[in-house]
């Protein structure tokens, strides 16, 4: 049966030019009459092959996620049978699927449906209107979260919202805005939800800004360690498991929309194996992945890295998995001391000026 995954699987393979050689194409004459025809044929297009020996293809035939042929319409259309899905590209360009070699699909997918995106929003007024509308439909105890993807420089006003502006829109719904890796803005409801008070100490490398009376204002700063930002965000409610499955599917669909068909997942903080990989494993087991995903495992405990790695190697081996989901080794850090701090404008406290 032709599926979105079948097509995307072929598209991601397009990035490897040797797959276009005859030795790597499926031969319908060798696979029997029942397998002679393609699942999908794209024709009448402009195919970017990345193959110098075959740079001007106009059609592609795909079966079981593999190329049967890449060439001219005349050559490829003979592989179309009565059940083949035929797509007339009408002269449009087909590009190789993009492979992102550092992203966080496993972690990001769990929360994608909970996040409001300000990517590409041209004015702060529009962004705040989006925030207001999201607050109106967000049920308690969930937060409204804008987790990066924007900068004040994209807004016509050339500034970030103030805490007072956020409080006016959301007096009772927690709001968390992450700006790059240098700061987070929390409204009063979010401060109450996380329990930050005048008695809450600053964590190492982070600052809870305070008013004249010592009460938190809602501005958190990485100075220079962004741990305060991540740890605060992690205090928010999680989605139920089945909602996380749905959220991850939406995240992958967004990646597909942008042309991404393969990723190296870099692990990341607050991402423990195997508990936090249950959702992506379920999607893999059910053949629901629409990106090829090679995942790294990231140590979670400073000074206990060796034990983390020993625990993992007892349950998962390097390259264990399949073409769509496999273990890719350790990363993104091997030891915590290897990490630099994210706010590069701040001096490192452990290094001389």
Task: Go through each PLM region and give its residues.
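Structural alpha-helical segments in enzyme catalytic/regulatory domains
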Residues: 318-320
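N-terminal pre-domain segments of enzymes
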Residues: 29-31
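N-terminal secretory signal peptides and thylakoid transit peptides that target proteins
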Residues: 1-15
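Boundary at the C-terminal end of the N-terminal hydrophobic targeting segment
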Residues: 23-25
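Divalent metal-binding segments
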Residues: 10, 35-43, 48, 52-314, ...
